[in-house]
Curated annotation (Swiss-Prot):
Free-text function comment from the UniProt entry: Presumably involved in the processing and regular turnover of intracellular proteins. Catalyzes the removal of unsubstituted N-terminal amino acids from various peptides.
Gene: pepA
Protein's recorded name: Probable cytosol aminopeptidase
CDD domains the UniProt entry points to: Peptidase_M17
GO cellular component terms, semicolon-separated: cytoplasm
Family, as annotated: Belongs to the peptidase M17 family.
Cited Pfam families: Peptidase_M17, Peptidase_M17_N
Keyword terms of this UniProt record: Aminopeptidase, Cytoplasm, Hydrolase, Manganese, Metal-binding, Protease
InterPro entries associated with the record: Leucine_aapep/pepB (IPR011356), Macro_dom-like (IPR043472), Peptidase_M17_C (IPR000819), Peptidase_M17_leu_NH2_pept (IPR023042), Peptidase_M17_N (IPR008283)
Top EC class for this record: hydrolase
Reactions performed catalytically: Release of an N-terminal amino acid, Xaa-|-Yaa-, in which Xaa is preferably Leu, but may be other amino acids including Pro although not Arg or Lys, and Yaa may be Pro. Amino acid amides and methyl esters are also readily hydrolyzed, but rates on arylamides are exceedingly low; Release of an N-terminal amino acid, preferentially leucine, but not glutamic or aspartic acids
Cross-referenced NCBIfam families: PRK00913.1-2
Length: 513
């Protein structure tokens, strides 16, 4: 786990393995480079010619680009790491940093990843205020992440190096309350987000509904969160037909986990619901061969909800947050749900199963109705729900649907504020008819075109009347199969954790409805 601290030490005198500085493209449109604020002392060590040296080495200032060079004479750190911030703002040198927060976050992440194996690195990136310090710290801690639980000696096999051990932020104010709070927030959120990443990356032979529930129970106990776990017996008694139906084919029984964080000062109540399919084979409607090893990530929504609730507790937010983890393994067997079966859901509605690979909406439906019974001020569900959303938005954006346009906008804006890319999506009423069933109240499939929207319409059927609700389909960005970028690693990303935490913060502050 990477440590994060603030320091007022001079860059030249700090004992570290490296000093990280920012470099940007000239705002004038030419090919020149600009050394970003925060690196003045380092630039002085090169007699004011750091930009020229970097240009000679081929640096362009592009976002996330990393260039290493020997530190100036007299510096106690042997290496300078210059990381690209993209285009420099016109007022970047005169009026604060003016650099986009996400550019700072991604730059810090890229630098931290490039420094794997180092024990300590000083980050001299632009810090105009406490928010910048928190942003840079967040990016560095996320970028330093490495999943090495299954590697010999706990080291990443690709480079044989352990993650960067300590990040020291220069340019901040260690005794200032705002700076301290920003760093503490960054640590709490990133540690829980990285825990979500660990869960997503854990092989399905080790992570199943029961073991996931055990992880949630342990974390709840540690952070004073009330937890309730419904096993198969309790789910059967309660009539949770959706969760039971999806888990029917697996030797690992399903679970519904309820995490309740409460604040004595809370005036609002949020409910987060996460899809937790610990492995999705498709069931009887078996998935074709190819990339099935990534289907361990189908519990990313539940991991995000779990992490967000724990982060809210660690931050002591003045809002009640309930997390619902709908956990099941979708496997084919002689006891599995078949296409054509009818399930009676927790809400009392019946669902004709036309495709057992449309299982996420079934477990979510039960959890959404359970969440609705408590009449929260709003419900947000998170799920790797449809390939259709990936076709629509690609691998880096998640779709946002809601039964209230203003709330949908608020969710999209919260995501943008924390650097998560999303896009508002509609719930077209004409697509609802495609889910009509001659046998049951509704079918779990509808028209093929607009499949992500159909799934959202299905979920809406299980939200209590009068309750504000949003659905986040994170199928694209939840698991990165490409090369790492910015602070995003290969594998589980922890998408939506920061959005959920921000929604909780806004609600606590009275700025979200």
């Amino acid at each position: 786990m990477t440590a994060l601290t603030l320091s007022t030490a001079a860059a030249s005198g700090l004992r570290a393995d490296a000093i990280v500085v920012g470099v940007a493209k000239s705002p004038k449109g030419d090919k020149g480079l600009v050394v970003a604020p925060g690196a003045e002392a380092v630039d002085k060590g090169y007699d004011g010619k750091l930009a020229a040296v970097l240009e000679t080495l081929g640096a362009s200032g592009a976002e996330g680009e990393v260039t290493k060079l020997p530190a100036p004479s007299g510096f106690k750190a042997p290496v300078v790491v210059a990381v690209g911030l993209g285009a420099a703002p016109e007022d970047g040198q005169d009026k604060g940093t003016a650099f986009d927060a996400e550019a700072l976050r991604r730059a810090a992440g890229a630098a931290a990843r490039a420094l794997a194996g180092a024990k300590k690195a000083a980050f001299a990136l632009p810090v105009a205020d406490a928010a910048d310090a928190g942003t840079i710290g967040e990016g560095a801690l996320l970028g330093a992440y490495s999943f090495d639980a299954y590697k010999e000696n706990g080291r990443n096999a690709k480079n044989g190096k352990a993650p960067l051990a300590e990040v020291v932020l220069l340019g901040g104010k260690p005794r200032d309350k705002a700076f301290k709070a920003a760093v503490e927030r960054a640590v709490a959120v990133t540690e829980e987000l990285n825990r979500a990443r660990d869960l997503i990356n854990t092989p399905p032979n080790d992570l199943n509904p029961e073991s996931f529930a055990a992880v949630a129970q342990a974390a709840a106990k540690e952070h004073g969160i009330k937890v309730q776990v419904l096993d198969e017996k309790a789910l059967t008694k309660g009539g949770y037909g959706g969760i039971l139906g999806v888990g029917a084919g697996s030797a690992a029984g399903p679970r519904l986990v309820k995490l309740s964080y409460t604040s004595s000062k809370a005036k609002k109540h949020l409910a987060f619901v996460g899809k937790g399919i610990t492995y999705d084979s498709g069931g009887i409607s078996l998935k074709p061969a190819g990339h099935n090893e990534t289907m361990k990530c189908d519990m990313s929504g539940a991991a995000a909800v779990f992490a967000a609730v724990v982060a809210a507790a660690r931050l002591g937010l003045e809002v009640n947050v309930t997390g619902w983890l709908a956990l099941a393994e979708n496997m084919p067997s002689g006891t599995a749900t078949r296409p054509g079966d009818v399930l009676r859901m927790y809400s009392g509605k019946t669902v004709e199963v036309l495709n057992t690979d449309a299982e996420g909406r079934l477990v979510l439906a039960d959890a959404l109705w359970a969440a609705s019974e408590e009449k929260p001020d709003a419900i947000v569900d998170v799920a790797t729900l449809t390939g259709a959303m990936m076709l629509a938005l690609g691998n880096r954006l998640f779709g946002v649907m809601a039964n209230d346009d203003a709330f949908r906008t608020a969710v999209v804006e919260a995501a943008e504020e924390v650097g998560e890319d999303s896009w508002p999506m509609p719930l077209p009423e004409h697509l609802r008819k495609g889910m009509d069933s001659p046998t049951a109240d509704i079918a779990n499939m509808g028209e093929r075109m607009g499949g992500g929207l159909v799934a959202g319409l299905f979920l809406r059927e299980f939200v209590g009347e009068g309750i504000t609700w949003a659905h986040l389909d994170i199928a694209g960005p939840a698991f990165n199969e490409a090369a790492p970028f910015g602070y995003t690693p290969k594998g589980g990303t922890g998408t939506a954790v920061r959005t959920l935490v921000r929604l909780a913060e806004l609600t606590a502050a009275g700025d979200l409805g």
